[in-house]
Amino acid sequence: MAGPGGWRDREVTDLGHLPDPTGIFSLDKTIGLGTYGRIYLGLHEKTGAFTAVKVMNARKTPLPEIGRRVRVNKYQKSVGWRYSDEEEDLRTELNLLRKYSFHKNIVSFYGAFFKLSPPGQRHQLWMVMELCAAGSVTDVVRMTSNQSLKEDWIAYICREILQGLAHLHAHRVIHRDIKGQNVLLTHNAEVKLVDFGVSAQVSRTNGRRNSFIGTPYWMAPEVIDCDEDPRRSYDYRSDVWSVGITAIEMAEGAPPLCNLQPLEALFVILRESAPTVKSSGWSRKFHNFMEKCTIKNFLFRPTSANMLQHPFVRDIKNERHVVESLTRHLTGIIKKRQKKGIPLIFEREEAIKEQYTVRRFRGPSCTHELLRLPTSSRCRPLRVLHGEPSQPRWLPDREEPQVQALQQLQGAARVFMPLQALDSAPKPLKGQAQAPQRLQGAARVFMPLQAQVKAKASKPLQMQIKAPPRLRRAARVLMPLQAQVRAPRLLQVQSQVSKKQQAQTQTSEPQDLDQVPEEFQGQDQVPEQQRQGQAPEQQQRHNQVPEQELEQNQAPEQPEVQEQAAEPAQAETEAEEPESLRVNAQVFLPLLSQDHHVLLPLHLDTQVLIPVEGQTEGSPQAQAWTLEPPQAIGSVQALIEGLSRDLLRAPNSNNSKPLGPLQTLMENLSSNRFYSQPEQAREKKSKVSTLRQALAKRLSPKRFRAKSSWRPEKLELSDLEARRQRRQRRWEDIFNQHEEELRQVDKDKEDESSDNDEVFHSIQAEVQIEPLKPYISNPKKIEVQERSPSVPNNQDHAHHVKFSSSVPQRSLLEQAQKPIDIRQRSSQNRQNWLAASESSSEEESPVTGRRSQSSPPYSTIDQKLLVDIHVPDGFKVGKISPPVYLTNEWVGYNALSEIFRNDWLTPAPVIQPPEEDGDYVELYDASADTDGDDDDESNDTFEDTYDHANGNDDLDNQVDQANDVCKDHDDDNNKFVDDVNNNYYEAPSCPRASYGRDGSCKQDGYDGSRGKEEAYRGYGSHTANRSHGGSAASEDNAAIGDQEEHAANIGSERRGSEGDGGKGVVRTSEESGALGLNGEENCSETDGPGLKRPASQDFEYLQEEPGGGNEASNAIDSGAAPSAPDHESDNKDISESSTQSDFSANHSSPSKGSGMSADANFASAILYAGFVEVPEESPKQPSEVNVNPLYVSPACKKPLIHMYEKEFTSEICCGSLWGVNLLLGTRSNLYLMDRSGKADITKLIRRRPFRQIQVLEPLNLLITISGHKNRLRVYHLTWLRNKILNNDPESKRRQEEMLKTEEACKAIDKLTGCEHFSVLQHEETTYIAIALKSSIHLYAWAPKSFDESTAIKVCIDQSADSEGDYMSYQAYIRILAKIQAADPVNRFKRPDELLHLLKLKVFPTLDHKPVTVDLAIGSEKRLKIFFSSADGYHLIDAESEVMSDVTLPKNPLEIIIPQNIIILPDCLGIGMMLTFNAEALSVEANEQLFKKILEMWKDIPSSIAFECTQRTTGWGQKAIEVRSLQSRVLESELKRRSIKKLRFLCTRGDKLFFTSTLRNHHSRVYFMTLGKLEELQSNYDV
């Protein structure tokens, strides 16, 4: 296929429109398997040519309410079909192949077909591609004699791979699954990349993604890190890492770490050094090539284009000879297959079978993946995306529940048996007498697997039926850890393992991690520890371990440890029911089970004890804290008491104590000193780090918070407190009763599922697990405070649970980070909170919350979670990354989970991570994550921003008086929270609206949706702003609201407030039930920075109705609560009841207000969205914003307004979206607001006013009207991005030099006095019209082969072929493809380097002074220039230079105030909507008036916007009006309480961004969501 163009550029949006393959292609035998379907040998029936046909199931499901077809942009487009996740990936792969397969290193794509099947069967999608007869690189390596390719062949293949990747990366596509199986070879040694099922377009801001996807062994560290830390991101350089791993695969026959389980490999890749080839027979160039490819920090890793210049792939000697020799080798492989009768396959038959059941997995980093998770998938860090595939090969087949439970308990017995064997083994085994001490210690702690395979089955364990289900989960969690211990250095312990089994273990081939291992899924399956080659009988023997073998394998080292660990009466008699199962269950069940969670102090995850410099292993301090192997076992066994004494001890005890046993164990694990021999530290590093990671996964209190509360004995028992205590006792009884029920294993298998453990998630209280055996004193005499009495062993081994309230202690880390923590309590003014441990629902909700990005890990740690630790002499406190769910950057922490401030056990809420069009953008240096003392306030980029924390004392006093709240004022302003009572509203919890790339309209003349509307083309990142009306366009506009009137409304009797809050959080009735809210209780909320509130306190919603609406509005405005019943609240105004005041950073106090429920009208108005999240604000840290998690109901039509908390000290004049982030131009600076997760404000350009800005991402340009002379300046986006990311002095110096030499910024023709500009992208040319005081200048960025005369006519010459396609991204593709194909030197140049700026024409405007200008293609396919003036609207033909006036309604007494020229996206670029005064009309570009007055605004709007859902929005003096373009009716009106200036900035999809100017000339940014496109299409004929 020669190149792009024509059908390639039209994106496939409806699979049903593809042709039928019958009569064109026929299928032969199966030759391979792709990600989602089989690959067949296809035969073109007319020519007899062979092809590869990928056949996949595809089904379309009609939505009943909008299951119809409509006409959009001349094309029939289905709006009534919704595709599944798998089918969306198929469409992605199909469109990527259509666009980019013209490259010689991408498999050629011949077409796609849709084969209809009979009713009841799924239809089939056929993708016909080039046949690569030699198979994949993996197959070629396996068919080679020594399973290794020659170095020259590797260099050639790597070069071809890099060329294909450079082609994809130039088009902003990340492959994300480069491996040997996805690199195919033809019979003549051509290299082709295949399998684009997981490829993705990168972010438009800085080209990054953060979804967790790929094949584990080839996965780059930054991709793995995105699963553990979604604040991270990666870019196309992750493919370069995969190329390096593929090179190792070609050199050694398998990728590194292929002998590990996939999850283990993920841990090792992220934490170990970069892999390399083991053999030393390779050249230095090859080693250097792999080192460059596998640089762990992707910011320093070369790109694919740079790697092509590496000598290893650039200087291939005798390339022709290399290709010929490789061709001969491939021909021999093909003939060898034919001789052996092996069919032409791309992968081995076993791999086909495995990959058919084992598919890729994805972590929940992408919001659209999280939304589809079932409710039973609670707290799974990794999930299967596509359906429920068959079990992977490391899991056995499902068996009967009784048999499976038996195997699970036997697995648990093997895990904990080493400790039991210590009590009963009389002497060490003779064969192990010579074994080093470390091997014996390892054998005790991790029972080797192979030692059990040949073990003689003596008597099966008898206690499995009586053990609680959590024990089986503990066994499943620890099984992979047990599998890790298979290593060559334990051969003396593993003498029973046959060489055949070892060979099978070593040669187990790599696999896609297509399904999550069982311990992360919570499914009731036993992890299969044997590799795929083992026989079923060996697996059966593996599940039954005799007690004698266990005793023989455990050699006691110190008798005193045995004596301390022995049970007086039961140690010898419990061989059948090992006591270690019961005892250690107390330790590992709370830590490791999936459904039973006990809080671990934060310092175990955020601090490790590291020996101070100069401290050696031999020093007394270090020796005192270094465990010998028996002591390590003792520490594990000491975890029993450690939980009850250390972790769950009363946090209000003020005496400091030595490090507890669990802290000691974690300290040793964290410092990689589990054994005392320092020379073995490197060898054990991977295993210990893997163990540490697995423990941290289970120990990390991701979904829970430690909350402080009053001691009950210190309180007077009021009615509310008495109710709470009764509820507490009731839940204690339920908890213990449910504990007894859980231990009945003989019930149905469903007892093992999460349904049986719902109470564990719904109970909020501190759990105290009482030990069932006396505490074994620590060998090093580490003192541990006794908290709960020891209980002798009983037959049932019940874990009794007590509920108590306690006050956590300040920790060392809390004191160290005092300036950073915003809620830490001073020791003098420590306040306590009331316990609120109640729950009224047993319904589980999936934990889908993820943390937001771009935040240093220690910026907002909740210090209340920390428990005191004692740091011994000679140690310092080191830091590692904290768990995400313990930081306030996590979205979920700012909302529902905060209601459980007083609880240790807290169910996590249903909260989605921030997402903007599926792309995450990270705008901070990755090295900032490692800084431990990040005080984000010390950043001079926030000069014009500050947190709104002023002048709230009076407001607080008013709230205190209105609510009768007894409050203890401190230095800081205290905050209150309104608790919204949702029991009256039965709105279901709705899934989040998938706005994404539904479209963006044209602003500023920059086309987002001309011609073929961008709303339906999937490219939604073209955004721009329009500055309306001239230099004083919005000077007379009014402001939004004032604190005095607002405070009066807050004091209404129907609102409740509480002391330690910020803004109220609204929940659905389902979520409220899960949290146990009722009308008698008010719960404290602490909200995060970012969106200060849904801004409903400034805007009131008015729905047009015959009467009643205005009265309700007046009632709200006057501060009186409306008396309408609750069911009428949807027809009333909305007003928020929360305050603007900051909450206290040092203390909190309970409130005794009588108004417990918030305004019902406000709740009703917001509840349609399902959930509106108001994160927490902080005066100490940059704001964290969560703008996207809106769950919009399909029935909702009311707009939502959200406000960003940051205020700007100068007026915001313009804005434009750059990717997901917002560029804001003020009267003094240019800022970037990071909307990806935190509302960080970065100052990009100082001391220069900006009047209008617009981002042109395809051209890598930012066009501005800026400066005091209103010059037209063009900035390079690359320079701005480097200004954000690179803060080192050398980079800053380089940036200043670029600015001086006009490499970063250039003034176009030194034009001054610019009023407005507009951009139109069409084909290869980008036009820009600039309005000056008396003329309009027309410029164009065109290919360097164009001149002025060609550029002005290119529209006419090519419009007939384009059929109205003005998609700028398609033009960008054409620019690259055509210009780069013409000259290979241009292959990797940026688009702006391939174009030149042409000055086309200057059009005098005679006596008309232009105010706004716009560009369009007229009905005669000619370029038209619209501009407005005080005299009306005018039209200029660009080619003939003829100017004419647009007909307006004649009213000689009226002065025309022009606002906007809006290109209507559904009119193929011909239709215009002209807005002026309080009217709007639509005209065609051929001067014909085809509609009369379209709309009549109630007031003259300052600015008007048109968005993709066919609605116009006007910002007037008194209200914001939303009108339908089709029905011409006023859909909604949001009134403002006081006058503020409003100015429209930009739009994306149905999100409209605008700004308001406050009375003190400060500005604030809002965005408004109007509703879903599908809902409007069901109501209007779009």
UniProtKB/Swiss-Prot annotation:
Residues 803-814, 825-834, 850-859, 1136-1154 have a biased composition (Polar residues). Its EC number is 2.7.11.1. It is an enzyme of class 2 (transferase). The modification Phosphoserine is found at residues 852, 855, 1027, 1031, 1034. GO terms for biological process: positive regulation of JNK cascade. PROSITE patterns: CNH (PS50219), PROTEIN_KINASE_ATP (PS00107), PROTEIN_KINASE_DOM (PS50011), PROTEIN_KINASE_ST (PS00108). It catalyses: L-seryl-[protein] + ATP = O-phospho-L-seryl-[protein] + ADP + H(+); L-threonyl-[protein] + ATP = O-phospho-L-threonyl-[protein] + ADP + H(+). InterPro entries: CNH_dom (IPR001180), Kinase-like_dom_sf (IPR011009), Prot_kinase_dom (IPR000719), Protein_kinase_ATP_BS (IPR017441), Ser/Thr_kinase_AS (IPR008271), STE20_Ser-Thr_kinase (IPR051700). The active site is at residue 177. It holds the Pfam family CNH. ATP binds at residues 31-39, 54. Residues 926-944 have a biased composition (Acidic residues). One of its GO terms (molecular function) is ATP binding. Residues 492-507, 527-538, 551-572 have a biased composition (Low complexity). Residues 25-313 form the Protein kinase domain. Residues 1209-1552 form the CNH domain. Keywords: ATP-binding, Coiled coil, Kinase, Nucleotide-binding, Phosphoprotein, Serine/threonine-protein kinase, Transferase. Residues 725-759 form a coiled coil. Residues 492-579, 783-859, 926-1156 are annotated as: Disordered. Belongs to the protein kinase superfamily. STE Ser/Thr protein kinase family. STE20 subfamily. May phosphorylate cofilin-1 and induce actin polymerization through this process, during the late stages of embryogenesis. Involved in the TNF-alpha-induced signaling pathway. This is Nik-related protein kinase. The gene is NRK.
